Amino acid sequence: MYTSQDSSDFFSPVSFTVISVCLLLLFAVLSLFAPSPDIENDFIRSRLDDSDQHQSAFHVPASGGAYRHDLWNSTNSKLFSACSNAGVNFAKADSKTHPDRYLLIATSGGLNQQRTGIIDAVVAAYILNATLVIPELDHTSFWKDSSNFSELFDADWFIRFLRNDIRVIKQLPNMGEKFVNPHTVRVPRKCTPKCYEGRVLPLLVKKRAVRLTKFDYRLSNMLDDDLQKLRCRVNYHALKFTDSIQEMGKLLVERMRMKSKHFIALHLRFEPDMLAFSGCYYGGGEKERKELGEIRKRWKSLHASNPDKVRRHGRCPLTPEEVGLMLRALGFGIDTHLYVASGEIYGGEETLEPLRALFPNFHSKETLATKEELAPFMSFSSRMAALDYIVCDDSDVFVTNNNGNMAKILAGRRRYFGHKPTIRPNGKKLNPLFMKKDNMTWEEFASKVRTFQVGFMGEPNELRPGSGEFHENPTSCICQKSGSEVKTGGFSSPQNQTHEVDNKVENRTEKQPAEEDREWSELDYDLDIRKQVELKGTKIDSLPILLGTDQAEVQVFFSD
């Protein structure tokens, strides 16, 4: 049995020396197989670099790259021309206008919604063989603009340009000793020519003067080519803004041109109402859900929202950041100048900041003009919208994150006047892509964006003739040069050939979209476009819904 003394003898100096020598030999042998400190540090550094590279794989470049031959022009635009002149068999106003029929209309909504009503009013007057009284504009809805027709448009030019098509007068004339009070009626939406002949014509014959109220989308989208061409003559030629609006609009364009040879105009809709209506979710947590949920309650006809489903269907408006990423992927670099036409942005400057970072050359009418220059227009929402309309129309590239009236009308106008590039986001493809972007490289993302946007860039023949709203796709008024062949990623069937004249009336039926496929501009808004005026000191936002479902008219709130 060992004693404490035995233990101390065991750990003698000689024993320690032997153990130390063995340990040194062991470390020496191990060092032959171990990597040097430099190699180990390099390995660790490499692992860290790989981790950083993975985290920063989605690195947005400042340069747009050279993905397209020419970002600022459409490929086949020279192969097409506008062709909206009346055909040889189109009856002229002098021979068909009945001397005792007067049509009056009251438009509805904002500038561009009212524009569609004015265009269709001319066609309705032609169908009814009636004299059109200069349209009455909407002064009571959300936009609260008191402008009359002649304060927005050149009334004399309007009357003069259309003199061969219909007779237009500025006011209802005195018809004998008794003052004629127009009979007021509202026609159904998408009313066909036969509908007008059946519903309105008997009233005109009996009452002599008929006033059609809330006149927006009250005429069928599908008409024979002669009537569609009349629509084009009104929209693209007869409706001219007043000199003061045109001069200010052109001044804004000139100031953009002074900053850059080319520029993009972006019509950005990201207001709280639009987002609430869409049923989309943008990552703002409970605060966003509560705020937008309260606004959404204003529409009685809307079902409970399913944000994931809405996004999968491509129904969510792109955020300002997503618009910026799309443009960069399409080839527009950080030096591109951007004119932004927008209303209130949900989230304010914080929401706009990513777009500004991508495109710091960020302009608006408020930054291009002085307060004094804008003063004559500031109190009139339609006149301010008209300024944006002019700049967007004259831009080299027009981009929109929505499919409202202004976007549709400008898309059609740009097709008519030379197929100027017009970028409409392919939401059904882009929305899922944006959700996955953090799991891919920028190169992969940009390549997919360019692929998905084929057919959404404003090239000729992207849309099938007759598809969509006519104001967006005026194929009856655009002719392809005889014998020319279009090579495009869109729909490639040739449009009207210039050597062919076909006024055949097609027996077409308009397809009514399912609710989930309807545009923001087509669903019921039970507060009659909210009418956000103050009634006896109380904002309409705080009022209960007043209209029953049997009274509610489809109002286009999200279109301008």
Residue ranges of predicted features:
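N-terminal targeting/anchoring "stem" of glycan-biosynthesis enzymes
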Residues: 1-560
